[in-house]
C-alpha cells in the first residue's frame, strides 16, 4: 500500500488528525528528529506567517552530551498544523515528544541524594524521575499518538558507553 493511501486511511479514521508520537531511550535523538522533521516536512507548508513563527518557536531544544534535555511530554507544535496532501485530502499534523526511558550514564535524572522526585499531572505525590519518564512515554503512545515512531541509538551520538546493550537488556525485562 502506498504511503499516501495509508495516511489517508489513518486520517479518515481519526477525523483528519495525525499525531506522531516519538519515543525511545533518553539521549537517542528524539527531539533532534522532531526538530528536523518539522523543519523539512511541516513548517515549509504553514501558510500563515504568525503560525509559522509560532511553530518555529515551539521546536524542542536539542543538544549533545549526556544531559537529558526533555523533561516532560510536549506537543509540537502546540496546535496541530493543517496540511494539504492533495486536492481532496487535508490532515492536521503534530508531533509528541517525550522524555523517554532513562538509561544508565544519562545525566539529569539524579541529584546528590539519588534519583530525583518530580511532580506529574498523573499522581498526587512526587514520583521518581525514571518512573515519571516511563509513565509519560507510555501515555504518549497509548493516549496521544496516531502513529508511533521509535528512535534508538548505538550510543555514539550521546557519548554514553554501552547505551545500546543497556537499552536492549531493559527492553527485554
What are these regions (language model features)?
Residues 2-118:
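Conserved G1/Walker A P-loop phosphate-binding module
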Residues 29-30, 157-159:
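Flexible loop/turn segments at secondary-structure boundaries
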Residues 79-85, 94-96, 134-140, 149-155, ...:
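P-loop NTPase catalytic core
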Residues 105-106, 159-163:
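Conserved ATPase-coupling elements of RecA-like P-loop NTPase cores
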Residues 167-173:
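Conserved small/polar residues in nucleotide/adenosyl-binding loops
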Residues 111-156:
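Inter-motif core of Ras-like GTPase G domains
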Amino acid at each position: 500500500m502506498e504511503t499516501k493511501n495509508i495516511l489517508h486511511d489513518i486520517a479518515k479514521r481519526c477525523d483528519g488528525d495525525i499525531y506522531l508520537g516519538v519515543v525511545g531511550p533518553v539521549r537517542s535523538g528524539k527531539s533532534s528528529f522532531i526538530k528536523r522533521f518539522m523543519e523539512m516536512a511541516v513548517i515549509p507548508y504553514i501558510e500563515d506567517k504568525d503560525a509559522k513563527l509560532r511553530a518555529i518557536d515551539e521546536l524542542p531544544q536539542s543538544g549533545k552530551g549526556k544531559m537529558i534535555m526533555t523533561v516532560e511530554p510536549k506537543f509540537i507544535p502546540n496546535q496541530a498544523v493543517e496540511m494539504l496532501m492533495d486536492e481532496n485530502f487535508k490532515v492536521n499534523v503534530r508531533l509528541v515528544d517525550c522524555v523517554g526511558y532513562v538509561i544508565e550514564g544519562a545525566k539529569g535524572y539524579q541529584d546528590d541524594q539519588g534519583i530525583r522526585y518530580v511532580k506529574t499531572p498523573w499522581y498526587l505525590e512526587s514520583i521518581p524521575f525514571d518512573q515519571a519518564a516511563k509513565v509519560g512515554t507510555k501515555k504518549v503512545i497509548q493516549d496521544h499518538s496516531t502513529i508511533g515512531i521509535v528512535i534508538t541509538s548505538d550510543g555514539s551520538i550521546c557519548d554514553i558507553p554501552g547505551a545500546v546493550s543497556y537499552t536492549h537488556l531493559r527492553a527485554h525485562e
